[in-house]
Structures are given as C-alpha cells and as structure tokens.
C-alpha cells in the first residue's frame, strides 16, 4: 500500500493546526522568498542552492517511483492488450489537447496583440543572448528524440533520471513479469512491498519543500526583480489569463463531461500546485501527483503510463506559450505574419514540442526550435522575453500539471479503470452517507 501524503492522516486528538499542512508552509515560504528577494536581492540570489538541492532530492526518487508504479501496475493486468489501449488512448488525448492549446495561444495572440506598438528593430537585438538555447534547439530532432527513449543500459536510465527511458524499461519489465505468471510472483510481491518505503521516503523529502520553495523564489525575484515583470506586463498578463481560461473553461468542460469538478481537483492537488509555483519545476510534483491520482481511484497501471508520458507529450501550458510568444515577437518587431505563415508556425510547433520534451528549459528551447524553422520570425527576438521567461515558466508548469491530472482521470474512465466512488471521496464530493454532494456527478 502506498504511504499517505504528509497531511492525509489527521491527528487522532483532533484536526491538525492549519500551519502544519504542507501547502500552508509552502505558500508562506513563497511569500517570504518574494519579500527577501525584493528587499535583499543579493542575498536572494545566493539562496539558489536551496531550490536546486530540493529539486535534486525529488529527482532522486522519480525513477524508482515510476518503475515501481508502472511495473507492478502492468504485472497485475490480466489482459496485456490493455497496455497498448491505455497508451493509445493517452496519446490520442495528448495530441488533441496539445494541438488545441497551440491554436488557443495563436488565436489569443491575434486578438489581444500583446506585442503591437513596441516597434523594435530586429537588427538591434543581440542574438548572442539566446545562442545557447538556439544551439540546444538545433541538437533536437524527432528521430533523435524517439531513439533516445531506448536507454543504452538499464543502469544508465536510472542514473540519468530520464523519465521516458525509465518508463520504457518499466513497461517492458512489467509485461515480462505478467507473461511469466507464477514464476514472477515473488518479484511482484517484493516490488509491492518496496513501494511503501519508497513513497514514505517521498513524504519525508516533501518536508523540505518549504525550504526549497523559499530559496527558489528568493533567487528568482532577487535576480530578475519585480521590475522585469512590469516591462512586459502585457505579455505576462495575457499568458496567465489565457492559461487560467484554458484550465477552467477547456479542462473544466472536459472534467465536467467526465463526471468531476475541476475546482475540486485543483483543491485536491493544491500541495503539488504550490510546490510547482515555488520551484518552477513540474518534476518536483511528479511523485506526489502519481500518489494522489492512485488514491483518487485511478488504477496504478493507468497512472504509471499516463503521467510520466504526459510529462513529455501533454504540455498544454508550454504549447499555449509557444504560439503566443512567437506571435508576440513578430508583433514587437513589426513583422506581419500571413495566415499561411501562422499555420506553418503551428505545424512546426506541433512537431518541435515533442522533439524538445523532457529537457531543462524545454519551453524556451522548444520556442527556439520552432523559430529556427520559421524564417519570418527572428530567433534573436527571443532576447525580448529572456528576462521574464522564469516568471512564464511557473505558469507553464502549473498548466502542464493540471492537464496531466485531468488526462489521467479521463483515460482511466475511458478504460473503466476509475473508481468513481473513491474519486468522489478524494475530491470531497460525497457526504458521509455516500450520496453525491456536487464534487462528482455520475458519469454517463
């Protein structure tokens, strides 16, 4: 059995004090980090190791969490064809909503035009500022990305912490365990027993989340300053509002159609959302999200396949950002893109968003990869948004996280691998008597 999250078990003598909840501590740490970074920027920049150390601690356990969840989930399947069905349905969902996110970003950019009137001469931009990102973008390709999913060695996949490589091996190992039947029971029992201490370790590491969030936020504000936000407030505001509308309207409609409330889901994963907000890293929340989705009634086999894959292929926030930022650069530099140019941009973004997935700074590097193929928009124009990308990355990561949580529940429901009563209890949507109370409606 997977260990409960930090605040899942209430004190036997009564409810725990509000300040003992992880999400309250992380929220307070974020606020403290903002204040320290603003008033003492030099000290704030020196606290970067706190955030980096916490993210490394979490990444340390991501590989074993994925392996144990996927391998034991698939090993327990009676029908191995279901593995292919789950993966196929997940990829169909990812493709549909990733494309929709790209289109929404493009439409919003054309309607709001956040870069209009800036009149920046492209020749005045310094291409050296974004040279590193452009070089990394050129190193990425669809073929290279797909072949890189196969690890050179099993140990190498775990040592590097490559999510897709670990997932690839875990799926194959789980299938092998299922095929050997009784001969593999001892291995399955061992892996199931190992799951509890691994997730207990995750819970222990999460106690350091407030420290990591404090250090990361103090560094961000200390280095970039609140002033950098004000300079490009139109773009930042447009992106944040668009992402919010995407979550509450688009994903909200998907959630409602599938029998649950997006607001209740956000409340349920609030700790993971605040963790992402504080660290700007969606990977920091991956173990906790997998744990909570299983506790919400999604079968382990679905959780293990959908969430790690979604971290590379279901990047709704990143996709909104890509088309919105690309058109912002064009508008700011006075470049008028025809609808043909914009469709080309959309098609290239659909491919490059997959080829650059799973790498550090994926959003910015993916944008560089897209612009390098579309000659109308100068790659050097990315220098305009380099200073605010850190603030944009938080919104990208938050939207990506919510998108993957919704995707997991939807795919589980499609496969009849969702315990709707358990989901209702997890989201707080049922009374003690078990009757629906608004958080979850019966699925049609």
UniProtKB/Swiss-Prot annotation:
Its main location: membrane. The keyword Cell membrane applies. The keyword Lipid metabolism does not apply. Keywords: Cell inner membrane, Cell membrane, Membrane, Symport, Transmembrane, Transmembrane helix, Transport. It is found in: Cell inner membrane. GO terms for biological process: L-aspartate transmembrane transport. It is a multi-pass membrane protein. GO terms for molecular function: fumarate transmembrane transporter activity; malate:proton symporter activity; succinate transmembrane transporter activity. The chain crosses the membrane at residues 17-37, 57-77, 92-112, 139-159, 161-181, 201-221, 234-254, 320-340, 368-388. Pfam families: SDF. Responsible for the transport of dicarboxylates such as succinate, fumarate, and malate from the periplasm across the membrane. Belongs to the dicarboxylate/amino acid:cation symporter (DAACS) (TC 2.A.23) family. This is C4-dicarboxylate transport protein. It comes from Rhizobium etli (strain CIAT 652). The gene is dctA.
């Amino acid at each position: 059995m997977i260990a409960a999250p930090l605040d899942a078990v209430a004190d036997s003598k009564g409810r725990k004090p509000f300040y003992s909840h992880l999400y309250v501590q992380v929220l307070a740490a974020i606020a403290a980090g903002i204040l320290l970074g603003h008033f003492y920027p030099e000290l704030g920049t020196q606290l970067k190791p706190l955030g980096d150390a916490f993210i490394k601690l979490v990444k340390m356990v991501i590989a074993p969490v994925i392996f144990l969840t996927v391998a034991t989930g698939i090993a327990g399947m009676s029908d191995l064809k279901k593995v292919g069905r789950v993966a196929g349905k997940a990829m169909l969902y990812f493709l549909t909503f990733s494309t929709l996110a790209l289109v929404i970003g493009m439409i919003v950019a054309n309607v709001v035009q956040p870069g209009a009137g800036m009149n920046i001469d492209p020749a005045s931009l310094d291409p050296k500022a974004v040279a590193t990102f452009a070089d990394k973008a050129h190193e990425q390709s669809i073929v290279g990305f797909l072949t890189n999913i196969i690890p050179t060695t099993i140990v190498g996949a775990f040592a590097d912490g490559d999510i897709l490589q670990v997932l690839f091996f875990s799926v194959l190992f789980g299938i092998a365990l299922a095929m050997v039947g009784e001969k593999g029971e001892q291995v399955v029992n061992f892996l199931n027993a190992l799951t509890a201490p691994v997730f207990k370790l995750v819970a222990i590491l999460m106690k350091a989340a407030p420290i990591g969030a404090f250090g990361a936020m103090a560094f961000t504000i200390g280095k970039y300053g609140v002033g950098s936000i004000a300079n490009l407030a139109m773009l930042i505001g447009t992106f944040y509002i668009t992402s919010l509308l995407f979550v509450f309207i688009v994903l909200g409609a998907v959630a409602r159609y599938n029998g649950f409330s997006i607001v209740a889901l956000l409340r349920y994963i609030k700790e993971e959302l605040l963790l992402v907000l504080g660290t700007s890293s969606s990977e920091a929340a991956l173990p906790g999200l997998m744990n909570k989705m299983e506790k919400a009634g999604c079968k382990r086999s679905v959780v293990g396949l959908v969430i790690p894959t979604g971290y590379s292929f279901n990047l709704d926030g990143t996709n909104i950002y890509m088309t919105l930022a690309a058109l912002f650069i064009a508008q700011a530099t006075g470049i008028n893109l025809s609808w043909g140019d914009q469709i080309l941009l959309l098609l290239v973004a659909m491919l490059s968003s997959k080829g650059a997935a799973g790498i550090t700074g994926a959003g910015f590097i993916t944008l560089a990869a897209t612009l390098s193929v579309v000659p109308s928009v100068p790659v050097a124009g990315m220098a305009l948004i380099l200073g605010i990308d850190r603030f944009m990355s938080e919104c990208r990561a938050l939207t990506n996280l919510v998108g993957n949580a919704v995707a997991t529940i939807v795919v589980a429901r499609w496969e009849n691998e969702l315990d709707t009563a358990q989901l209702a209890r997890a989201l707080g949507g049922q009374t003690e008597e078990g009757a629906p109370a608004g958080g979850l409606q019966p699925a049609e």
